[in-house]
């Protein structure tokens, strides 16, 4: 099933997203993503977005599994080379959010969690390294995650020009830090990309309101491609990939456990309309806020 929402069809800027259940089987993940990209191409999508961990998600074997399966961005015959070929062959832009990137000569053998934009010529035009890392230890609930043990945080904010507008890049846990998105908006972002793999418990409580808040407060579209379903016996993702407009209206909300695509035709003029109706960025007192 393919879901489509049309907004002011005189403006043909079509963005799509894919919702998948990745595993530690790279070939199977690539096959699923390739099929989704081909569907997107059939439906004339200009930019197609895949979720965090699109290429690989830990099988729960050991805590360094993601690191051991990481690759360099320019690795000969690597997974990113295959996606670059897909983009070029299909004349489509790709947002690949949450790739385990090897760091050359890192003394601690760390990796980056990297969001890539690949253009329709198969060229990487933007790279964002996840800034906010998820470390939590709740003994009473038996929950312990330590992303920073394996992943090195990035420092650079990234806004990327594309045929569909200016893209503000982020990944998953970044969503909880509104200052990041405020900064992206101040860098003229029109569309916020939030590829994610939210856990079910936090997803049910916070996913939708956080996405709507980022859309409303920055008056931007939000495109949030998400992992869904059971990856292995100890890890499940919430799903509910969403596309939200600058007024906060949810245009798409893919059901949990559904591997599918959705797309919309967006009109950048609508962003201007929302910003004119409520010109909050003209009224901000940035010098007065102490953060």
From Swiss-Prot:
SUPFAM superfamilies: Carbon-nitrogen hydrolase. Keywords: Hydrolase. Signal peptide: none annotated. It comes from the Eukaryota. CDD domains: nit. The keyword Nucleotide-binding does not apply. The keyword Cytoplasm does not apply. GO terms for molecular function: deaminated glutathione amidase activity. Residues 13-268 form the CN hydrolase domain. Its EC number is 3.5.1.128. It catalyses: N-(4-oxoglutaryl)-L-cysteinylglycine + H2O = L-cysteinylglycine + 2-oxoglutarate. It holds the Pfam family CN_hydrolase. Belongs to the carbon-nitrogen hydrolase superfamily. NIT1/NIT2 family. Catalyzes the hydrolysis of the amide bond in N-(4-oxoglutarate)-L-cysteinylglycine (deaminated glutathione), a metabolite repair reaction to dispose of the harmful deaminated glutathione. This is Deaminated glutathione amidase. It comes from Dictyostelium discoideum.
